[in-house]
Amino acid sequence: MSRFSGALQLTDLDDFITPSQECIKPVTIDKTKSKTGSKITVQADGYYEESESGKQKLQKVEITLQDCLACSGCITSAEGVLITQQSQEELLKVLRENERLKASGDSDKVRTIVFTIAVQPLISLAHRFELGVEEAARHLSGYLRQLGADYVLSTKIADDLALLECRQEFVERYRDNADLSMLSSSCPGWVCYAEKTHGNFILPHIATTRSPQQIMGVLVKQRLAEKLGVSGSRIYHVTVMPCYDKKLEASREDFYSEVNSSRDVDCVITSIEVEQMLQTEEQTLQQFAPSDMDWPWTDQPPEAMVWAHESTMSGGYAEHIYKYAARELFNEETPNELQFKALRNRDFSEISLEKDGKIVLKFAIANGFRNIQNLMQKLKRGKGPGYHFVEVMACPSGCINGGAQVRPTTGQHVRELTQQLEELYKQLPRSNPDNAHTKHIYTDFLDGTQTDKSQSLLHTSYHAVEKLNTALNIKW
């Protein structure tokens, strides 16, 4: 089995910007002086030797996540980069070590293992194993508990909080400067692209609200740790996500807690990696006893653990914020089902609200880098179509078609598979973020809404990455 997910490699997929072939991080290789020259042999498995009078195994070059985040040589995520701490192998190693510590009675070093599962991987795995989504969640929970999980959580509470924070942020920005477009922040592929390619020009437009993954990180490492009476560093937090970019997001310095001396999310695995782990064991989800997911946030759990947020597949930001802004800013009620108008392609759509003959709200959804690039060019030229808010996602069709979702198994076209996943999503119950659970988190943990604590824990900042000119960037 490969050291990392088989899909994590350079691709030439349409509408996907692959990383630069050159990494700008210089790596020093000690060379031996020779009058006759040396021969370097590279084996298929990556083992390579330098031979002259004998053989010398060369040092394996590893690029860490921090190198990748500080680099400006790539456009999107970690494709083609060896990510040593964000793989299924690293996860299984940690779980085995934890079980060994339990068996030896060394309780002081045992960690609490917490898994958080996003809705898109659940839908992908449900389709792969021909299960209902809630049923798949319970079987996956059973599988993860067998691996060593102490808690298995859904992202529902964080999805709700992200919408509440983002809508409030939009209303405040609109009142301060209605001409400044606000762009969503939950997609790390898009954020990475913005930081490295457009820098200080575009960063003021991006919402500061953290993604649901990172909000879950705060809740697990602080709120759950507090309830368990342990330090956040004693919790090993794993998330199951639909794309590899989430691995980079979890490794940002912004999401390292000095209070806990640990990252809010320790490890990210993806839908396809879960499938590979099951394939390695020659198992299916159905073979694991179902187990209820945990709900440690309030005394009374919700009716279900897997929820949809609006009708779009990437968190429902554009829809939810549009409805809230129309009501909050203009006292206008909108239909439950909004009708976004597709423009040049199905991955770019818009909706607007008119009042007294004037467009007062104009929202858009832009999925895929082709549409993102077009949007950026219009903003830079000052010829933007006047959008007040744009939900931006790097993947065509959004998170439901994330780059690490389970692949088609029968020669099925990706578009057809995506449509089937969308149908499963539409069958889920709709979450209303204004609920007793989020209110409890605000009052019991965040000292209320719009407080210094909520601002500190639920928001983040961005950093332009300076383009470096090195010899490795030169193309001969």
UniProtKB/Swiss-Prot annotation:
Annotated InterPro entries: Cytosolic_Fe-S_CAF, Fe_hydrogenase, Fe_hydrogenase_lsu_C, Fe_hydrogenase_ssu
Single Gene Ontology MF annotation: metal ion binding
Any Pfam family matching the protein: Fe_hyd_lg_C
Record keywords: 4Fe-4S, Iron, Iron-sulfur, Metal-binding
Residue sites binding [4Fe-4S] cluster 2 per the record: C187, C243, C395, C399
UniProt: [4Fe-4S] cluster 1 binding residues: C23, C68, C71, C74
One Gene Ontology biological process: iron-sulfur cluster assembly
Highest taxon in the source lineage: Eukaryota
Keyword Oxidoreductase: no
Signal peptide feature range: none
Function, as annotated: Component of the cytosolic iron-sulfur (Fe/S) protein assembly machinery. Required for maturation of extramitochondrial Fe/S proteins.
Homology family: Belongs to the NARF family.
Protein name: Probable cytosolic Fe-S cluster assembly factor GI11683
